[in-house]
């Protein structure tokens, strides 16, 4: 029967194309074409009176039919291109059949035969359309230079991008290691810069550039550091100055109790200074001239006394 032959042909094509069906559209097209040829071969065998056929026989006849049709198409295309045309016509196919030794006059009688079997078209199964869960905007149409059979552009939501940022590292150990490596890199870069720009010394006499060392520069005036005040002395001087200012503010805030004897002594001092203005000028001059801290008179630290509530 034709159904048995078609089943055998379909099974043979399955073994030929592979046990698993491919999801590639090109592979699906070749598989569908192969099955169509097997159905045609099965119908021809049924018309010839065969009830069943072996798998190898169906495959051989399918290959012969496919080769015959391919040769007709190739020859028709070559005749078409020979006459400076791009698409073959019926005359090209007729010339091809004549060149292949086929009698074209027998085609109408063969098409009108009484035992001809009508092959129905295979059912077209449309793939289920999955609803789009997310739609943002409208799809872009194809530009004029892109053919319409090409796939459509992706949905607009696929072009949406969200920039990502790396979270800052908050681990204490990692931060310490990173700070130590940065400090080490800075020190190495600084020493290399000093070695390239300044004078260097080498541990090896033969090769000077192998292990350069920064040359030690002696001070031009070595005793200058002994004459300059240190940080401790400057801090002590600032503390004494601040204590004097505090005492001065305390004396300004306290009520003045001046005895008559003290007032008389102050009047005498002011009268002496008025008679000899050179004394006050010399004192002010000495204080302004003496700028070296080692030549200044020694100042004992004053003890701050707490105010008594009376």
UniProtKB/Swiss-Prot annotation:
Residues 297-310 have a biased composition (Basic residues). The modification Phosphoserine is found at residue 271. One of its GO terms (molecular function) is protein heterodimerization activity. It comes from the Eukaryota. InterPro entries: BTP, Histone-fold, TAF8, TFIID_su8_C. The modification N-acetylalanine is found at residue 2. A motif (Nuclear localization signal) lies at residues 294-307. Residues 1-29, 235-310 are annotated as: Disordered. The keyword Phosphoprotein applies. Residues 236-250 have a biased composition (Acidic residues). Residues 35-102 form the Histone-fold domain. Keywords: Acetylation, Cytoplasm, Developmental protein, Differentiation, Nucleus, Phosphoprotein, Transcription, Transcription regulation. Pfam families: Bromo_TP (PF07524), TAF8_C (PF10406). GO terms for cellular component: cytoplasm; transcription factor TFIID complex. It is found in: Nucleus; Cytoplasm. The modification Phosphothreonine is found at residue 130. Residues 270-283 have a biased composition (Polar residues). Residues 1-19 have a biased composition (Low complexity). GO terms for biological process: cell differentiation; transcription initiation at RNA polymerase II promoter. Belongs to the TAF8 family. Component of the TFIID basal transcription factor complex, composed of TATA-box-binding protein TBP, and a number of TBP-associated factors (TAFs), including TAF1, TAF2, TAF3, TAF4, TAF5, TAF6, TAF7, TAF8, TAF9, TAF10, TAF11, TAF12 and TAF13. Interacts with TBP, TAF1, TAF6, TAF10, TAF11 and TAF13. Component also of a small TAF complex (SMAT) containing TAF8, TAF10 and SUPT7L. Forms a heterodimer with TAF10. Interaction with TAF10 is mediated mainly via its histone fold domain while interaction with SUPT7L is via its C-terminal region. The TFIID basal transcription factor complex plays a major role in the initiation of RNA polymerase II (Pol II)-dependent transcription. TFIID recognizes and binds promoters with or without a TATA box via its subunit TBP, a TATA-box-binding protein, and promotes assembly of the pre-initiation complex (PIC). The TFIID complex consists of TBP and TBP-associated factors (TAFs), including TAF1, TAF2, TAF3, TAF4, TAF5, TAF6, TAF7, TAF8, TAF9, TAF10, TAF11, TAF12 and TAF13. The TFIID complex structure can be divided into 3 modules TFIID-A, TFIID-B, and TFIID-C. This is Transcription initiation factor TFIID subunit 8.
């Amino acid at each position: 029967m034709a159904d048995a032959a078609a089943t055998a042909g379909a099974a043979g094509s399955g073994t030929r194309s592979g046990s698993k069906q491919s999801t590639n559209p090109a592979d699906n097209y070749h598989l569908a074409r192969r099955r169509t040829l097997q159905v045609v071969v099965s119908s021809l065998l049924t018309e010839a009176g065969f009830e069943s056929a072996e798998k190898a026989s169906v495959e051989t006849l399918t290959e012969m039919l496919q080769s015959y049709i391919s040769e007709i198409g190739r020859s028709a295309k070559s005749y078409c291109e020979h006459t400076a045309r791009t698409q073959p016509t019926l005359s090209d196919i007729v010339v091809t059949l004549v060149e292949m030794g086929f009698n074209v006059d027998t085609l109408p009688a063969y098409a009108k035969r009484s035992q001809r079997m009508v092959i129905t078209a295979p059912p077209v199964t449309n793939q289920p359309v999955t609803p789009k869960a997310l739609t943002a905007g409208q799809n872009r149409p194809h530009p004029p230079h892109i053919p319409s059979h090409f796939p459509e552009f992706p949905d607009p939501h696929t072009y949406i991008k969200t920039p990502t940022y790396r979270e800052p590292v908050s681990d204490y150990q990692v931060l310490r290691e990173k700070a130590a490596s940065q400090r080490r890199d800075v020190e190495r870069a600084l020493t290399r810069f000093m070695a390239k720009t300044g004078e260097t010394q080498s541990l090896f006499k033969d090769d000077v550039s192998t292990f350069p060392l920064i040359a030690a520069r002696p001070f031009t005036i070595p005793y200058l550091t002994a004459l300059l005040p240190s940080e401790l002395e400057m801090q002590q001087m600032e503390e004494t100055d601040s204590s004097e200012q505090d005492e001065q503010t305390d004396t300004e805030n306290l009520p003045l109790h001046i005895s008559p004897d003290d007032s008389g002594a102050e009047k005498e001092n002011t009268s002496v200074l008025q008679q000899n203005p050179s004394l006050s000028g010399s004192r002010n001059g000495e204080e302004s001239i003496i700028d070296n801290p080692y030549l200044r008179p020694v100042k004992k630290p004053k003890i701050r006394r707490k105010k008594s509530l009376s």
